[in-house]
Amino acid sequence: MEALHQKIREQGIVLSDQVLKVDAFLNHQIDPALMKLIGDEFATLFKDSGITKIVTIEASGIAPAIMTGLNLGVPVIFARKQQSLTLTENLLSATVYSFTKKTESTVAISPRHLTSSDRVLIIDDFLANGKASQALISIIKQAGATVAGLGIVIEKSFQGGRAELDSQGYRVESLARVKSLKDGVVTFIE
């Protein structure tokens, strides 16, 4: 997606050969016009997949997930990292390791919002080692629902997440596939 590539080139900051900072438009400050384009693109890619729900993890996946949900006309569920007093029932949950935060947390979704008849699209801001995606897949399977695909805003293709998801047979659509962050330069897979 050229608009996303351009935004990454202009405002992304390479912190190391493993870390790309995009807080100017995606995961701290949000560019609504770009999120609309991202939602449009994911909706086009998955329009014929029978999606009934979108699932993401709070917080950075919420903006692209909402815009995709708006386009597809389906609800968006975000897995919570912190248990709320309002989440009182037995939760669907999984443990996830954050590559950038170097921490492990439990994410959870209420079983009231996900059923065995749902076809779920996972939307996330980044795909690195695939741990967040695997946690969401686990939660969706606990509900007996079907994973219809994954929409990733930025994929770090040099890490193993995509290969693992591909080997499990999941459809993965990434809007920006980063080949390398070497020497402070973002190189895309075109």
From Swiss-Prot:
It is found in: Cytoplasm. SUPFAM superfamilies: PRTase-like. GO terms for biological process: purine ribonucleoside salvage; xanthine metabolic process; XMP salvage. One of its GO terms (molecular function) is xanthine phosphoribosyltransferase activity. GO terms for cellular component: cytoplasm. Pfam families: Pribosyltran. Keywords: Cytoplasm, Glycosyltransferase, Purine salvage, Transferase. It is an enzyme of class 2 (transferase). It catalyses: XMP + diphosphate = xanthine + 5-phospho-alpha-D-ribose 1-diphosphate. Xanthine binds at L20, N27, K156. Its EC number is 2.4.2.22. Pathway: Purine metabolism; XMP biosynthesis via salvage pathway; XMP from xanthine: step 1/1. It comes from the Bacteria. Disulfide bonds: none annotated. 5-phospho-alpha-D-ribose 1-diphosphate binds at A128, N129, G130, K131, A132. NCBIfam families: PRK09219.1, XPRTase. Homodimer. Converts the preformed base xanthine, a product of nucleic acid breakdown, to xanthosine 5'-monophosphate (XMP), so it can be reused for RNA or DNA synthesis. Belongs to the purine/pyrimidine phosphoribosyltransferase family. Xpt subfamily. This is Xanthine phosphoribosyltransferase. It comes from Pseudomonas fluorescens (strain Pf0-1). The lineage of its organism: Bacteria, Pseudomonadati, Pseudomonadota, Gammaproteobacteria, Pseudomonadales.
